[in-house]
Amino acid sequence: EPGETPAWERLVSTLYSPEERHKIEWCIGAIVTGESKKLQKFLVFYGAVGTGKSTIINVIMQLFEGYHTSFSAKDLGSSSNAFALEAFRANPLVAIQHDGDLSRIEDNTRINSLVSHEMMTVNEKFRSAYSNRFKTFLIMGTNKPVKITDAKSGVIRRLIDVTPTGDK
């Protein structure tokens, strides 16, 4: 039986257009139903400071309390960071970064493989390397435009971008 969510209705309809709201709720639904483990998508909230990106991300964190972790997109996009996947070692349902930066990703291979749920080699400090297939759905907020260096990269078609209205 459908319930009522007046606080969510008021919050999300103020901060986001109906189209952007649909994207957010679609992603949440995909995570709840387990479809996100098969989908090759990730969610990026892009907008000015103070427009509600972290507000919605905080709600998502509360929904998946105990099933999320934090990550660094900068580390994932750096070919020199051998331990970038260490944050995913527990294979969380959701990985979140409130204030990320995808404007200067030098190598998007790792992000693409992670979002595509491909087998990856994981290096953890003080442990032997091992392989894992992560089923994690990535969510991040950013104030900077996303810039993918390789126009043919799979990251572009996997990105779901959400922009706030700027209303308060």
Language model segments and positions:
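Conserved AAA+/SF3 P-loop NTPase catalytic/coupling segment centered on the Walker-B
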Residues: P92-H117, Y130, F134, I148-V155
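A short helix-turn-beta junction within AAA+ P-loop NTPase domains corresponding to the substrate/partner-engaging
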Residues: A151-D167
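Short, polar/flexible loop-turn hinges at active-site or ligand-entry regions and domain interfaces
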Residues: T14-E20, V146-D150, K168
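Substrate-gripping "pore-loop 1 plus following alpha2 helix"
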Residues: F71-S80, T109-S128
